[in-house]
C-alpha cells in the first residue's frame, strides 16, 4: 500500500483531544448525547449539554470541557474559536453480575462501560461580509 500525500493535510487547523475511559454509562446512551454536539462550537455544545436531560450528558460535558482546556493550555488556542471536530463513543469492558431469581435461577446483568473521545479544532472566525443588494437602498 502506498500513502497518498494530501495538500490540505498540511494546512489543517490545530486540534486538541480529550478522552474519558471506563465511564459507567452504556455506549448506546452516550452516543445519543454525543450526536447532539457534533459540528457545534464548543461553547454552544457545552450549553446544549448543560440542559440535556440524559444522565450521559454529565460525563460528555466533562470530556468536552477537558478538550477545551487542553486546547487552551497546551496549544494556546482561543476557546471562542473552538469547534467539535470529532466526537465518538467506543464500548469498554462489560461488568457481569447476577441477579438471583426464583427456583434457583440467576439472570445476568451487564453493566456496560464507555470510552468517550472528543476532539476540538480551532477554526478562524469568519468576518461578516456585506451583502451585494440591500433592500430599500438608494441606487
Swiss-Prot record:
One of its GO terms (biological process) is translation. Coiled coil: none annotated. One of its GO terms (cellular component) is cytosolic large ribosomal subunit. Residues 125-139 have a biased composition (Basic residues). Gene3D superfamilies: Ribosomal protein L22/L17. InterPro entries: Ribosomal_uL22, Ribosomal_uL22_bac/chlpt-type, Ribosomal_uL22_bac/org-type, Ribosomal_uL22_CS, Ribosomal_uL22_sf. It holds the Pfam family Ribosomal_L22. Keywords: Ribonucleoprotein, Ribosomal protein, RNA-binding, rRNA-binding. Residues 118-139 are annotated as: Disordered. GO terms for molecular function: rRNA binding; structural constituent of ribosome. CDD domains: Ribosomal_L22. It comes from the Bacteria. SUPFAM superfamilies: Ribosomal protein L22. Signal peptide: none annotated. Belongs to the universal ribosomal protein uL22 family. This protein binds specifically to 23S rRNA; its binding is stimulated by other ribosomal proteins, e.g. L4, L17, and L20. It is important during the early stages of 50S assembly. It makes multiple contacts with different domains of the 23S rRNA in the assembled 50S subunit and ribosome. The globular domain of the protein is located near the polypeptide exit tunnel on the outside of the subunit, while an extended beta-hairpin is found that lines the wall of the exit tunnel in the center of the 70S ribosome. Part of the 50S ribosomal subunit. This is Large ribosomal subunit protein uL22. The gene is rplV.
